[in-house]
Amino acid sequence: MKKGIHPENYREVLFYDASAQMGWVIRSCVATNKSMMWEDGKEYPFYPLDTSSASHPVYTGKRREANTEGRASKFNERFKGMASLAAKK
């Protein structure tokens, strides 16, 4: 590898997808102050992922159901009086 072309913080970082319980150790410059012990017994800077190829439905082929019950009940609560107004007309 050519010397002097990478930033000072270019190091091995553990990217971890908690929803899929999978992680990858990759060289990166990502800013993080967390660290985690990995399967190989070494401690790496740790960067949590919301989604990755291990958990995203496009890559896994599995469908995830979104929790819409809260939103639907909020909508119904907000507009419950509208049905009676429409029926009166």
From Swiss-Prot:
Q: Which Gene3D superfamilies match?
A: Ribosomal protein L31
Spell out the PROSITE patterns in the cross-references. RIBOSOMAL_L31
Q: Which UniProt keywords apply?
A: Ribonucleoprotein, Ribosomal protein
Q: Name one GO molecular function term.
A: structural constituent of ribosome
Biological process terms from the Gene Ontology for this record are: translation
A GO cellular-component term linked to this record: ribonucleoprotein complex
Query: What InterPro entries has UniProt attached to this entry?
Result: Ribosomal_bL28/bL31-like_sf, Ribosomal_bL31, Ribosomal_bL31_B, Ribosomal_bL31_sf
Report the sequence similarity comment from the record.
Answer: Belongs to the bacterial ribosomal protein bL31 family. Type B subfamily.
Q: State how it assembles.
A: Part of the 50S ribosomal subunit.
Protein name as annotated: Large ribosomal subunit protein bL31B
